[in-house]
UniProtKB/Swiss-Prot annotation:
Keywords: ATP synthesis, Cell inner membrane, Cell membrane, CF(1), Hydrogen ion transport, Ion transport, Membrane, Transport. Produces ATP from ADP in the presence of a proton gradient across the membrane. It comes from the Bacteria. One of its GO terms (molecular function) is ATP binding. GO terms for cellular component: plasma membrane; proton-transporting ATP synthase complex. Its main location: membrane. This is ATP synthase epsilon chain. Belongs to the ATPase epsilon chain family. It is found in: Cell inner membrane. It is a peripheral membrane protein. InterPro entries: ATP_synth_F1_dsu/esu (IPR001469), ATP_synth_F1_dsu/esu_N (IPR020546), ATPsynth_dsu/esu_N (IPR036771). It comes from Bartonella quintana (strain Toulouse) (Rochalimaea quintana). The lineage of its organism: Bacteria, Pseudomonadati, Pseudomonadota, Alphaproteobacteria, Hyphomicrobiales. The keyword Ubl conjugation does not apply.
Length: 138
């Protein structure tokens, strides 16, 4: 039987406050302005705008999920870095924190007539609350 080696690349997730994640990974799915973008080793160079959504990171030890808000992705053949305005590791997000953040977003969107943004926010929170057991009761 042929032994295929999975190639890894360096993925870094950075907020204005700190380096949130830096590890060799198998793949990353990021929420770009043009849709979900899957990055793997040896990807063509690309700079992409990041929108509100979730980042799925596949590592040798499993999958990690992060909630992100706006930013930029710099993808090279040897790695990928995301600089985002806000990021939360979903496994560290409690229902109380999630409810507080939902309330803040709703307050921000009150009076906003842009249904497209409202639907994106609803889809994003739906993804978070259905993240297959990664959220824990506070």
């Amino acid at each position: 039987m042929e032994n295929k080696r999975v190639e890894h690349f360096l993925f870094e997730l950075v907020s204005p406050e700190k380096l949130v994640f830096s590890e060799q990974v198998i793949s990353v799915v990021i929420p770009s302005a043009s849709g979900a973008l899957t990055v793997m080793a040896h990807h063509e160079p690309l700079v992409a705008s990041i929108v509100l959504g979730s980042v799925r990171v596949l590592t040798s030890s499993g999958e990690k999920l992060f909630a992100v808000c706006r930013g930029v992705a710099n993808i090279t053949s040897s790695g990928c870095s995301l600089l985002v305005e806000k990021v939360v590791a979903v496994e560290h997000l409690s229902f109380d924190v999630l409810e507080q953040q939902i309330s803040q977003v709703r307050a921000t969107l009150e009076g906003d007539s842009d249904d497209r943004i409202s639907h994106k926010v609803q889809d994003f929170f739906h993804q978070l609350t259905n993240a297959d057991g990664v959220l824990t009761e506070a």
